[in-house]
From Swiss-Prot:
UniProt biased composition (Pro residues): 379-393
Spans traversing the lipid bilayer: none
This protein's GO CC annotations: nucleus
Example of a GO MF term: zinc ion binding
Alphabetized UniProt keyword annotations: Metal-binding, Nucleus, Transcription, Transcription regulation, Zinc, Zinc-finger
ZnF (C2H2-type 1 degenerate) residues: 661-692
Compositionally skewed regions (Polar residues) per UniProt: 181-190, 200-218, 253-277, 428-437
Organism: Mycosarcoma maydis (Corn smut fungus)
Major localization class: nucleus
Subcellular location: Nucleus
Name the record gives this protein: Transcription regulator rua1
Phenotype of null mutants: Results in complete loss of ustilagic acid production.
Residues covered by region (Disordered): 122-169, 181-218, 237-295, 372-393, 422-582
Induction: Expression is strongly induced under conditions of nitrogen starvation.
Length: 757
């Protein structure tokens, strides 16, 4: 392997780019790990994160078969062992375009994590590592260009650890190894103090790590006990900006000149405002892996955390050994108490979504209380879990357990991990506290009393309004139903009580025979008759005494009285007598002849429906206005030419009147001029003659007429389009005409698109 000094330029700062992260294909472990493009790092980062959520790797997938034997050998020979120390020399090409078969088992996005997470093994069965332990990791490189931060460092206690491949300020290295001093040339002697200065970590992180390492001396299983130090730096961006400015300033300074300007005068320093040296500005995170400046990690920290636990803890967890838990009142085994957590999860997923969300909120509150009790600095000392389960531990449950507890121990982490990894894997949108609605549900302040009271009052008012409207509609419908029944079955007055037992018996028999007569009489009625307001029908027999005026009509008398149920009517004399006999009851007559008869006792004539013809020559009743020579000179009357013979609406004569154009009505017997500008001609033709201005024809007549036997002879017409009875003549003073029917036909006789028919 090329020494570190060979890749350090004398004019540049020793910090180089971060290691490239593998794409989604390299994560599958079946292909070789190739360097990614620096322009789509964010997209591939999201793909890796989604892939890790849906299908996280585990030792059961046989992807780490070549790695576990080597790591176990190093674990047995060292009490403080890092995963990077057990790496074989075959991983030298990770990050380059040409890699060997051994390096394809690992994706290079896991390499920076190997030095950020430390594991502790039992000190009773292990000894201190020898200096030759780090010799294999000395030749290990995570980038195509050797980085100074990747060099292994020796602490004062003799333990070896590898600093993060990411150029961060809180690295875990303390000093350069003495074994590599002979490789540093005289030309790079001035760069060596800078490298040593950058590798020195803050004191509080070292104390925290030492304190935590001392508390885990008696653990039987490795644990992920601390998050990488650059997570704190990720939360504090100002520190990163200051370091970025310091790095830029050191790179731009001439060779042999320090950052503090010691031993040089102020004249030798380039002024900040000069064009040769521009003031460096803090920038956002750099997603590129080829930049020369300070580079931030481009992979989410959760990926590193989960991958670290998989590499260190799954083998011992599957073997059934006791697992140390930072939470003393919990156990990693309690997630496998019931087998339904694995087999019956899909059946209870929908019904337990709210419970899982509530449980996540309780977990957040409990972690907050534990952190506040411990002053938010150090976690509580771990305790060993109870005896192992009869069957092996579920890797997913142990994985979720350790991930959640490790996240809770990091006081700088924004939000803890969900406790159930199966919910996160199957339904990350609803059950995950990081991505779903749990964070918005459990972390919002509770509404005030005024808001709750206002909301409840508004909801109650809306409910009352809806209930009130429902009651009003029900009352209105019942009123309409009773009004319809009043025409068919009028209530008998209390004064008309039967005077003898025989009459009461006859009334009872009439009520019993009423449904029979109704079912027997329906067969004689045409299909066009509606089923409303109809009770019983009786067809008159064919006799020779019928009048010739009624030969073309079919008259049917319907009576609701008890005395006229079985009686048959024949001829106009019988009809008049029937009406007189049924004066105390309500009855009507249905006829197919569309003729409006005059009221009884009035001298009016019968009014027939206009002749349904499409020829104007048959409809017109006059030959036009009479025009003399003097009137022709004053008012010019024009005769409209080239009209269709079936057009009954267009006037045949027009003139220029005082209020605009006027048209002559050819259907009136005497004829008359009507203003076309003020729609007089339109209303006259539609409502007096029944001619539509759209179809230029007559409206369709009613199918049948229903004449009630009352004082005003109320007449209804059956519409063929809506199949309803339309009042035509009603009221004692109303003129008997078809104007009401024409108004209904103008609105009703249309197709589905609204066109008149």
């Amino acid at each position: 392997m090329m020494p570190i000094s060979a890749t350090i330029d004398s004019k540049s700062f020793p910090f180089d780019t971060t290691p490239t992260y593998a794409s989604l294909d390299a994560y599958q472990m079946d292909q070789r790990a190739l360097p990614t493009s620096p322009f789509n790092g964010a997209v591939k980062r999201d793909q890796m994160f989604d892939q890790l959520l849906l299908d996280p790797p585990s030792p059961t997938t046989s992807r780490f078969d070549g790695m576990w034997p080597t790591s176990n050998a190093q674990a047995n020979a060292s009490s403080s062992w890092t995963p990077s120390a057990g790496m074989p020399d075959a991983f030298d090409g990770v990050g380059n375009s040409l890699v060997n078969d051994a390096s394809s088992d690992w994706s290079d996005f896991l390499m920076p994590l190997l030095a950020t997470v430390a594991t502790d093994f039992s000190s009773g069965s292990a000894t201190k590592s020898e200096p030759s332990t780090c010799s294999s990791s000395t030749d290990f490189s995570m980038s195509s260009t050797a980085d100074a931060s990747t060099a292994p460092q020796h602490s004062s206690s003799g333990d070896s650890s590898m600093s993060s491949g990411l150029p961060v300020s809180t690295a875990t290295c303390t000093a350069m190894p003495a074994a590599q001093n002979h490789q540093v040339t005289t030309q790079d002697a001035s760069v060596q103090p800078k490298l040593e200065k950058q590798c020195q970590p803050p004191s509080h992180n070292v104390n925290q790590q030492n304190a935590f390492a001392s508390s885990n001396q008696d653990n039987n299983c490795p644990q992920v006990h601390i998050i990488a130090s650059w997570l704190d730096q990720d939360a504090d961006r100002n520190t990163g900006h200051r370091q970025h400015n310091r790095h830029q300033k050191q790179q731009n300074l001439p060779q042999g000149q320090s950052c503090t300007n010691s031993g040089s005068s102020s004249r030798q320093v380039t002024r900040p405002n000069s064009p040769n040296h521009q003031r460096s500005r803090p920038q956002l995170r750099s997603r590129s892996s080829t930049g020369n400046g300070y580079t931030w990690p481009s992979v989410d920290p959760q990926v590193f955390l989960w991958a670290a636990f998989m590499m260190n803890g799954f083998q011992q967890a599957q073997a059934g050994t006791a697992t140390a838990s930072p939470m003393s009142d919990y156990s990693a085994m309690e997630y496998d108490d019931e087998p339904q957590a694995q087999h019956g999860y899909h059946a209870t997923e929908n019904c337990n979504v709210d419970d899982a969300m509530d449980g996540t909120g309780d977990f957040c509150k409990k972690e907050d209380r534990s952190q506040s009790a411990d002053c938010g600095l150090l976690p509580r000392p771990p305790s060993n879990s109870p005896e192992p389960h009869p069957y092996p531990l579920d890797p997913m449950a142990a994985f979720a357990r350790a991930a959640a507890e490790s996240m809770a121990m990091s006081y700088s982490w924004p939000m803890p991990m969900p406790t159930n990894m199966m919910e996160l894997q199957h339904n990350p949108a609803r059950s995950n506290s990081t991505f779903g609605r749990v964070s918005q549900r459990h972390h919002q302040p509770p509404p005030s009393h005024r808001q709750r009271s206002r909301t409840s009052a508004s909801s109650i008012s809306n409910t009352n309004a809806a209930h009130r409207k429902h009651k009003v509609d029900a009352v209105r419908q019942s009123a309409v139903r009773s009004r319809r029944q009043s025409f068919v079955e009028p209530r008998q007055c209390a004064s008309q009580s039967p005077s003898s037992p025989s009459e009461s018996t006859a009334a009872t028999d009439a009520k019993l025979t009423k449904p029979r007569a109704q079912s027997a009489g329906r067969s004689h009625v045409t299909e066009r008759l509606p089923h409303l307001h109809t009770l019983s029908y009786s067809t008159p027999p064919d006799t020779s005494s019928s009048v010739s005026a009624l030969t073309s009509t079919t008259t049917t008398t319907v009576s609701t009285g008890a005395s006229s149920v079985a009686s048959s009517i024949s001829g106009p004399s019988s009809a008049s007598s029937g009406i007189g006999n049924a004066s105390g009851s309500l009855s009507f007559t249905i006829t197919d002849k569309i003729v409006l008869k005059p009221r009884p006792g009035s001298g009016d004539e019968e009014l027939a429906y206009p002749c349904a013809t499409n020829s104007l020559l048959e409809m017109q009743n006059n030959e036009g206005p009479i025009v003399d020579a003097q009137q022709q000179a004053e008012e010019a009357v024009e005769k409209v030419q080239n009209l269709f013979p079936s057009d009954l609406y267009a006037p045949r004569f027009t003139r220029r009147g005082t209020c605009g154009r006027e048209g002559w009505c050819s259907l009136c017997p005497q004829g008359e001029w009507y203003s076309m500008k003020r729609s007089q001609y339109l209303y006259h033709m539609q409502f007096d003659h029944g001619i539509s201005n759209l179809t230029r024809r007559l409206f369709h007549p009613p199918q049948t007429l229903r004449v009630w036997n009352d004082a005003v002879s109320k007449t209804d017409g059956l519409c063929h389009h809506c199949n309803k009875w339309i009042p035509i003549c009603f009221g004692p003073q109303r003129k008997r005409d078809f104007k009401a029917w024409f108004k209904h036909a103008r609105k009703c006789h249309r197709d589905d698109t609204g066109c008149p028919i």
